[in-house]
Amino acid sequence: MKAILYFILIPALLPVFIILRYVYLLDKKEREPLGFVLKVVLWGAIFSIPCAGVERFMLSFLSGFYDPASIEFAWMENTIGVALVEELSKWLVFMLLVWKNKNFDYRYDGIVYAVSASLGFAALENILYVISYGTGVSIGRAIFAIPGHATFGVFMGYWLSRAKTFWLDDKKIRMRICKLFALGVPMLIHGFYDFLLSDQVAALDLRSVFFIYVILLDFFAWRVIKHEFRTDRML
């Protein structure tokens, strides 16, 4: 039983650990309390649990307005029915646990905590995939799905750090705009990512577009991380 558990957990969680460790250790100025980071990871996983039910409801709702075989349905399904639900769950974890926490006091912290929430979500999702489809899926998910969730978290954290700066400066309108961007930007890039993998788009043979998109996403996420940890300062 123990061997089976390890056989499932190691391939499912190893890429999560590697990415989280990398992002965490880049925080040179004031490293975040590891216990609190892991708490955010845990709640990211917990908040992912109701997402499947909400997504099923959203897809049923959207099918009343769009032909399920259409490109329009694929776009709405993946942006509103999936990406919005999943990114909102991560955004809520951040707002409930991190936003007013005293440890969220440097700009790079936003990325650390948003990526932590995203990887918590990805961790449980990955465990369920490995249980359902076997360890064979873990390689593809380690290359694409888990780094994808981390990338969405990078952009969320970037905008939430900007929102916190405006909140502290009592610039409430700018704060709200940045909070909206913190949800909207990850939702759109996540939605387009899933859209390119949908059956409707697969019929158009646009796999090369997907790979180019992933490379560009990873490149820009790395540039954001690099900029944020090099210019890190107190909020």
What is each PLM-predicted segment?
Residues 1-235:
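Hydrophobic alpha-helical segments at protein termini of multi-pass membrane proteins
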